[in-house]
């Protein structure tokens, strides 16, 4: 996508971010949030800015080529207490110009506060350095402006994980109403003075009536009209579910159905195991550790191929399998020879001689990246 292809709201969001404003970019699925942020990142990187790209999970971080929030900021897993003050600057943040957090709805408020306190301390040190410059004190390096914060996601879609046990513990620690645990419930949310920009035009779907219904469903509005619309598009004739796609909001239900369908296919099951080294957290994994396949089973790719042979969401059928190679026929008839995909889980570090964010290999994770 090029700038000329952006909608008015998308173009406005891009310009506001390029002007250096802190932005909360939101909108329903298919409104182009990721496309806009990719343009912004490309532009700022070309301008020599250091961008720390993060997301709550490995899968979300992988989309923008970033790392998980926990790894980027060294955040602990689980409930985070709010009592520990920040006493020193983090080297990575000293080199950072812009922080991008994708899927902000999945970032729980206590994790957001952990991040915000680190940024607040860093920005305070930068303000002190700018003041020193103004009164003529020589600094080894020019003082920097505050870190620009860009957060994007949809609070109507994916909530943060908040178990009963965690909620009970958090209520003892945080003495304010954090509701469902969303990041905007944090007392630090307003510190960034985000400009909220809501993308409203669905660009991934051309059917105007369907787009309208999708928007209503997202906002839980016009329930009777939406129900009537969906029912009018359901079949009144007997039909086979043999090749139908089943949707579920629960991973265990999906796994049960996949196992059932796989067992119904003839032939032997071939099992692929992920090869991994180092300390990799569960939230940083972007695919299952074990994958069971048979010839004839249907799969869906969950990454984009650099070659363009397939993209996230491409459907296909397994034709043949070897230990390190799988032959897949995509839905449009193309044959893809799939080999093991290597994903390096990295953490940001800074070299003393060059104040640039560098990526240091932390752990390797080699997986066959597709899903039944």
Model region roles, listed by residue range:
Residues 1-372:
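Conserved ATP-binding/catalytic motifs of P-loop helicase motor domains
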